[in-house]
């Protein structure tokens, strides 16, 4: 079997013969659960060192370099030096021998028919004409690529060039690494690339800094704007600006690193948000008194889709043993024929809805992970066969397609969250929670999450618009040479916007869910107080007659307590004895029913139940409002009769983080604090990555499998 010699290092490899189509490798990469993959991603993100060798770069590592500008360093594998040098030497040798190679002795793109022997000057001109970006006089940051994305691009480009197929000196890669490690970031234009032939325009600004172009700018370690000379000094690069050798300019700019770097950042966030959406859906089921049957493993196994099966299993894990589920089961057992047999789609089909989105995001992650470990410039230098291969690996189609698909998945997740949020704040659907999740004693002066619901509609609308594909808007470019192009970075940028909006929606929904958790806590304590009060008043007023004899009305107590169990607390809590509210109406109806069944006894004032109704109501009105207020005050003062059920649930780590560590609280119209202030706390924490640990803590005990079918 013919073997291929790896460039310059003398070792043989059989990667062209073993698994020649790479489907086996792609299949192997999808083994295991999505959650395990996310955990590994987070672990990679938190490592203090990223070791680059060209073939093992991960999404988590790229995200770490992008976000952690002072907590992680990059190290280059010394073993790669020989291969890099071999391809660089080959270019110089071939140039000296008069070999005709694209971008080395020829012009570029549609003008590649031009020829020159001035290889260094050609590279210099390449960088000059590609410096075509617009920054708005350097003051408008909205036209500058985020520095995090630039750092990601630098890392990915180094990784590609380390593989030794690009014809560039190792010293240039070391210089870019020093920029990363000293937190010096070149300023790249936000727009201007079609990611085929690579990200030419933005990458040319990295090359411009390396070559000391006078228009090159960078941002220093403390955020200050610096020129190329200052950048080299701060980075400790003492060799001076680089004079590019033949092919080196092309090696720097002719790649997909900006698009794939930003895509890596986006996918790190998207994967975490996908897991969060699964946990959020389970919490939604808890506070909505949902039926957990929708997570049963057999249902999902029969559908076959792994994303759906895992989403259901994760929700099942959260709901297993949940106090809310147990309480809801008792609730559903009362008058079952008068209630819907099953929950609405936003709850009941959430695994079926989220599953495909998780599969899409996971597939996109693998696609981008392959891309950031690829050699994606042109021509490729094959030292072993003594030739330059002219192809099109610079075409960033995997990025554009992966990002379009990811953005559509993100929009679908957002749509589900909006549907769930809309049910949660609507008292027609939310099984007894107050309208708008108002937390005040006076609902007429508290409109709770009404503003947040409007904002959620806005977020969702923008997210649905962003779901439109980018890749079908290709324009023929560069004298019709680049007549099809990937638009990879544009799609990555739009997906980054979508991720930000999904964070806005997720943080808003989390605050609303935990408002609902606290309202359920109030509900449970108030119901207990009402039940005890009704029982006590019934015993005092309905048990005996005027002369102490047992009275027929004593048999009504059980039915009166059943009324309390059935009625929604927040339908009467602001004024429990108001006769137009359902509690007093139903209590009276119950006593009237007993009176009608009392027959001849009603003719005797001593045995009449009708005569007892007024006495019962009068005493209840004298006591109940105070008891309801005491119950609510006890919850607010941290001494409730019944503890908050969330404390025993697997979703508690998220609740605890949002309430205790972020310092959020139950929102009411009586307080000055606005919903936006609380939402901001959660959103900021989410952007800073602080939500990851409590999120994963909710699933710490999950063994990666559904509950057994019994």
Swiss-Prot record:
One of its GO terms (biological process) is cinnamic acid biosynthetic process. One of its GO terms (molecular function) is phenylalanine ammonia-lyase activity. InterPro entries: Aromatic_Lyase, Fumarase/histidase_N, L-Aspartase-like, Phe/His_NH3-lyase_AS, Phe_NH3-lyase, Phe_NH3-lyase_shielding_dom_sf. Expressed mainly in roots. SUPFAM superfamilies: L-aspartase-like. It is found in: Cytoplasm. CDD domains: PAL-HAL. There is a cross-link at residues 196-198 (5-imidazolinone (Ala-Gly)). Its main location: cytoplasm. Contains an active site 4-methylidene-imidazol-5-one (MIO), which is formed autocatalytically by cyclization and dehydration of residues Ala-Ser-Gly. Its EC number is 4.3.1.24. The modification 2,3-didehydroalanine (Ser) is found at residue 197. Keywords: Cytoplasm, Lyase, Phenylalanine catabolism, Phenylpropanoid metabolism. It catalyses: L-phenylalanine = (E)-cinnamate + NH4(+). It comes from the Eukaryota. One of its GO terms (cellular component) is cytoplasm. This is a key enzyme of plant metabolism catalyzing the first reaction in the biosynthesis from L-phenylalanine of a wide variety of natural products based on the phenylpropane skeleton. Belongs to the PAL/histidase family. This is Phenylalanine ammonia-lyase 1. It comes from Lithospermum erythrorhizon.
């Amino acid at each position: 079997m013919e073997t291929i010699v790896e460039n310059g290092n003398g070792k043989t490899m059989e990667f062209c013969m073993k698994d020649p189509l790479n489907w086996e490798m792609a299949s192997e990469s999808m083994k295991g659960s999505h959650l395990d993959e996310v955990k590994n991603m987070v672990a990679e993100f938190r490592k203090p060192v990223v070791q680059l060798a060209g073939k093992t770069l991960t999404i988590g590592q790229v995200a770490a370099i992008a976000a952690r500008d002072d907590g992680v360093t990059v190290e280059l594998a010394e073993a790669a030096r020989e291969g890099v040098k071999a391809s660089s030497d080959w270019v110089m040798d071939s140039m000296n021998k008069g070999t005709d190679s694209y971008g080395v002795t020829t012009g570029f793109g549609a003008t590649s028919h031009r020829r020159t022997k001035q290889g260094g000057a050609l590279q210099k001109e390449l960088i000059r004409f590609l410096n075509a970006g617009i920054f708005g006089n350097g003051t408008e940051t909205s036209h500058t690529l985020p520095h995090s994305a630039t750092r990601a691009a630098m890392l990915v480009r180094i990784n590609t060039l380390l593989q030794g197929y690009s014809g560039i000196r190792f010293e240039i890669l070391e210089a870019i690494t020093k920029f990363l490690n000293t937190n010096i970031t070149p300023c790249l234009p936000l727009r201007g690339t079609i990611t085929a032939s690579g990200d030419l325009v933005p990458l040319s600004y990295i090359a411009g800094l390396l070559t000391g172009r006078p228009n090159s700018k960078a941002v220093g370690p403390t955020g200050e704007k610096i020129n190329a000379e200052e950048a080299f000094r701060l980075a400790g690069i003492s060799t001076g600006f680089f004079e590019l050798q033949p092919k080196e300019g092309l090696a720097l700019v002719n790649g997909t690193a900006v698009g794939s770097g930003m895509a890596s950042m986006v996918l790190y966030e998207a994967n975490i948000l996908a897991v969060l959406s699964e946990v959020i859906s389970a919490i939604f089921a808890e506070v909505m008194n949902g039926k957990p049957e929708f997570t049963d493993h057999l249902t999902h196994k029969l559908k076959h889709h792994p994303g759906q099966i895992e989403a259901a299993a994760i929700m099942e894990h959260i709901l297993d043993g949940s106090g809310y589920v147990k309480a809801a089961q008792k609730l559903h057992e009362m008058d079952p024929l008068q209630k819907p047999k099953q929950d609405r789609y936003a709850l009941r089909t959430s695994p079926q809805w989220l599953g495909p989105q998780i599969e899409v995001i996971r597939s996109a992650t693998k696609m981008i992970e392959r891309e950031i470990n690829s050699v994606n410039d042109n021509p490729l230098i094959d030292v072993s066969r003594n030739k330059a291969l002219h192809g099109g690996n610079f075409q960033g189609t995997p990025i554009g397609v992966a990002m379009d698909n990811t953005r559509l998945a993100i929009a679908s997740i957002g749509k589900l969250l909006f549907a769930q949020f809309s049910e949660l704040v609507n008292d027609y659907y939310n099984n007894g929670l107050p309208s708008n999740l108002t937390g005040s004693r006076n609902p007429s002066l508290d409109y709770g999450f009404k503003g947040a619901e409007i904002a959620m509609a806005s977020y969702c609308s923008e997210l649905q618009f962003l779901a439109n594909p980018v890749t079908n808007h290709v324009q023929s470019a560069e004298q019709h040479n680049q007549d099809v192009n990937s638009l990879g970075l544009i799609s990555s940028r739009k997906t980054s916007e979508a991720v930000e909006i999904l964070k806005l929606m997720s943080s808003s929904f989390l605050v609303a869910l935990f408002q609902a958790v606290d309202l359920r806590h109030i509900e449970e304590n108030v119901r207990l107080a009402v039940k005890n009060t009704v029982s006590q008043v019934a015993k005092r007023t309905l048990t005996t007659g005027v002369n102490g004899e047992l009275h027929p009305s004593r048999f009504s107590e059980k039915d009166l307590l059943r009324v309390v169990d059935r009625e929604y607390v927040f339908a009467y809590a602001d004024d429990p004895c108001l006769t137009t509210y359902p509690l007093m109406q139903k209590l009276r109806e119950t006593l009237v029913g007993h009176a009608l069944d009392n027959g001849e006894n009603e003719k005797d004032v001593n045995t009449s139940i009708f005569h007892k109704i007024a006495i019962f109501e009068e005493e209840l009105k004298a006591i109940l409002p105070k008891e309801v207020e005491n119950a609510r005050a006890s919850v607010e003062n941290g001494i409730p009769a019944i503890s908050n059920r969330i404390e025993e649930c697997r979703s508690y780590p998220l609740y605890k983080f949002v309430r205790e560590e972020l310092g959020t609280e139950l929102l009411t119209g009586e307080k000055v604090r606005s919903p936006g202030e609380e939402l901001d706390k959660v959103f900021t924490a989410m952007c800073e990555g602080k939500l990851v640990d409590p999120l994963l803590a909710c699933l710490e005990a999950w063994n990666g499998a559904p509950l057994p079918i019994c």
